Every structure is written in structure tokens, then in C-alpha cells.
Design a protein with these regions (language model features):
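Glycoside hydrolase catalytic-domain context in secreted enzymes
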Residues: 1-180
Length: 180
């Protein structure tokens, strides 16, 4: 059961030699075997709808516990359709815009067999040299709060996570990451 806590960077999607964090190689057969053995609970960066169905079938039909896998990705400012980065979007001071772009990204993400996004990024920018400032809404605490809430609603949909077009939003980097 503890294996279900393992999140692996997906070695199936981006390139055949993608890095497997367990052994430094891209080894889809090994990852598939680990899924069968119940040693993997989620894959990061998605694998596409067709491959997702196939690998989910392995988890559900060939593993002992039959627990479905969770597919996750960083959907910071879109998936197939790319929107302005959150920092640029924040310049509009428009929560409806943040909601609509997150909703559109969620529809594409869910259609790609991804269940969870590591977004929105909610760090308050404290140092303009920090390279990840573009993932958040800047230095204003209130604006960060309002836009993050709008993005969570957009990702998770009006009907909640039961909606087939919803993805689980995971706010990240909350503990002074940009101030470190």
C-alpha cells in the first residue's frame, strides 16, 4: 500500500529516454512492472488519453489492490492552448479571466487523461530575480488570493471534481518559497 504514495515522472511521454527518478533511465517496461506490483500510485506529466487508458487498465486489472493511478501535470498557463503566464494575466486584475483560462485548461487537461494539476502557484513575489515569479500573480497578497481562488474554481469546475472536465487543483509553494 505504501507504494501508492510514489509519484514517478512519466517515462512514456516526452521521449523514449526520459529520466526515471528511481534509476536514472527511461524504462517503460520497468515502470509498468512497478505498477503491476503496486509500487506506483501516480505518474507526473501525463501520458495522453490513449496511453493513460492502457496503463490505467494495468493498474486496475493486473495489480493486486486494483487502485486506479492518478495522473498529474503542471498546467500553469494552459495545456494544449497556451495562455499568458499568470504574472501577465494578473496585470489585467480580472478574476473572471483567470477563471476562464483555468476552466479552458482544465477541459483540455481532463481530455488528456490528467486528473491533477500542480497549480495555481500562490507564492507572493518578494524577489524579482526569482525565476518562478511568472507562475504567480506578483507581489500583491490580495491579488494573489483572488486570482488563486478563481483559478482553483476554474480547474475544479462549477460542479466540482465529479465533473468529467474538472481537474484537482493543487496550490503550491506556499511557505515563502520566493523569499528563500
Amino acid at each position: 500500500k505504501a507504494g501508492q504514495l510514489n509519484l514517478l515522472a512519466d517515462p512514456f511521454r516526452w521521449m523514449p529516454t526520459a529520466v526515471n527518478p528511481l534509476d536514472g533511465t527511461g524504462d517503460p517496461a520497468r515502470v509498468t512492472a512497478m505498477i503491476r506490483e503496486g509500487k506506483v500510485g501516480s505518474l507526473f506529466n501525463g501520458i495522453g488519453a490513449e496511453a493513460g487508458r492502457r496503463i490505467q487498465q494495468v493498474a486496475m486489472e493486473e495489480s493486486r489492490l486494483k487502485i486506479p493511478l492518478l495522473f498529474a501535470a503542471d498546467v500553469i498557463h494552459g495545456l494544449s492552448t497556451i495562455f499568458p503566464v499568470p504574472l501577465a494575466e494578473a496585470a489585467a486584475f480580472d478574476t473572471q479571466l483567470a477563471y476562464r483560462t483555468a476552466r479552458a485548461a482544465a477541459v483540455e487537461t481532463a481530455a488528456s487523461a490528467v486528473h491533477q494539476t500542480y497549480a495555481p502557484m500562490v507564492d507572493v513575489a518578494r524577489d524579482q530575480r526569482w525565476g518562478r515569479n511568472v507562475e504567480g500573480a506578483g507581489e500583491d497578497v490580495l491579488l494573489n488570493n483572488l486570482l488563486a481562488a478563481a483559478r482553483v474554481r476554474g480547474f475544479q469546475g462549477d460542479k466540482g471534481l465529479d465533473d468529467r472536465d474538472a481537474v484537482l487543483a493543487t496550490a503550491k509553494h506556499m511557505a515563502a518559497y520566493s523569499a528563500a
